[in-house]
Amino acid sequence: MSYHRMTLSKFLLEQRKKGVIDPDLGSLINDIESACKYVAAAVSKGKLISQEVNVTINVQGEEQKPLDVIANEIFLKICEQGDQLQGMVSEEMESPYIIPPEHRRGKYLLIYDPLDGSSNLDVNLTVGSIFSVLKAPESGEPLEEKHFLRPGREQLAAGFTLYGPSVMFILTLGNGVHGFTLDREVGIFTLTHPDMRITPSTKEFAINASNERFWEPPVRRYVEECIKGKTGPRGKDFNMRWIASMVAEVYRILIRGGLFMYPRDTKDLSKPGRLRLLYEANPMGFIVEQAGGMISTGRESILDIVPRSLHQRIAVILGSKEEVELLNRYHNDYDSGKQEEFESPLFSTRSLFRNP
């Protein structure tokens, strides 16, 4: 066992010395790290712990899993005590959580999804936590919802923790993306994946193909061309994936490239996008761009969008840059009338597995 590992704490100390972050931001990241360790322990217990919690319907209109509630409480209790925050926003809370007056008024705002992909818990698949850090107002005015409604370009830090066979903590401070693996024996995150980079091209994409009939023509065009493989216009074979866990999809893309799509569709006209802008799309977009990838709605960069509400949903296309750029071009072609209505359903009159 090496005693000279670069731990997350040492890494943050180095970033402080380089002037990348200040001591308060470093301390906040350490608090988030601690929260994620507790969540990892809770997730690993599964039904052993979740039987004890009463569940309700959250602000999204979704039934909370017991571990959703537990993870949210862990983040609240640990992060409010560090004196670095003014407030927090979570997927599991309708309105901002204002730090109680007994704590020092901090310089930062924390936005987080305490347990992304929690629908996978019942089948024991990968879940994770996502977080984003913004600068808090300095004027001394009371903290309000509007202070959280800022474009993703203003993020100071973002990351996610993957609770899989190993626990991974992925972090960007705006100067690249780095991955840390939890050594469970000693309870320390150690740098194992420095300077993670997303390959510009790929042969792999992830999308929920059961929604094909609701997709816009540019997305159907893209997927159809990928499925045609070597015999189609792309001239290469693709693999299709779908885990239903954004943290797992993005981690795979960071490791070996790829494309993740949860595009705009017509399945529910009140929700043209499915993923949440503030605590899913923005932090993941910051990470992906810092790793050399790209994120878009198909029509604009997600990181440039000014949020309208805390729980705003949005279409998301992210991953290898060349593929995102191609999808942007397909959307532009369609919007400008250069692409005719695409009428080649994947799952109706012909098989995916038959040569055209």
From Swiss-Prot:
Binding of Mg(2+) 2, residues: D113, D116, E280
GO molecular function: fructose 1,6-bisphosphate 1-phosphatase activity; magnesium ion binding
Gene Ontology biological-process annotations: fructose 1,6-bisphosphate metabolic process; fructose 6-phosphate metabolic process; fructose metabolic process; gluconeogenesis; sucrose biosynthetic process
Any Pfam family matching the protein: FBPase
EC class (word): hydrolase
Statement: the UniProt record of this protein carries the keyword Metal-binding: yes
Cofactor: Mg(2+)
Record-listed E.C. numbers: 3.1.3.11
Primary localisation category: cytoplasm
Binding site for substrate: D116, G117, S118, S119, N208
Annotated metabolic or biological route of this protein: Carbohydrate biosynthesis; gluconeogenesis
Gene Ontology terms: cellular component: cytosol
Record key words, sorted: Carbohydrate metabolism, Cytoplasm, Hydrolase, Magnesium, Metal-binding
InterPro entries xrefs: FBPase_C_dom (IPR044015), FBPase_class-1 (IPR000146), FBPase_N (IPR033391), FBPtase (IPR028343), Fructose_bisphosphatase_AS (IPR020548)
PANTHER family: FRUCTOSE-1,6-BISPHOSPHATASE-RELATED, SEDOHEPTULOSE-1,7-BISPHOSPHATASE, CHLOROPLASTIC
Family: Belongs to the FBPase class 1 family.
Subunit structure: Homotetramer.
Protein name: Fructose-1,6-bisphosphatase class 1
Gene this protein is translated from: fbp
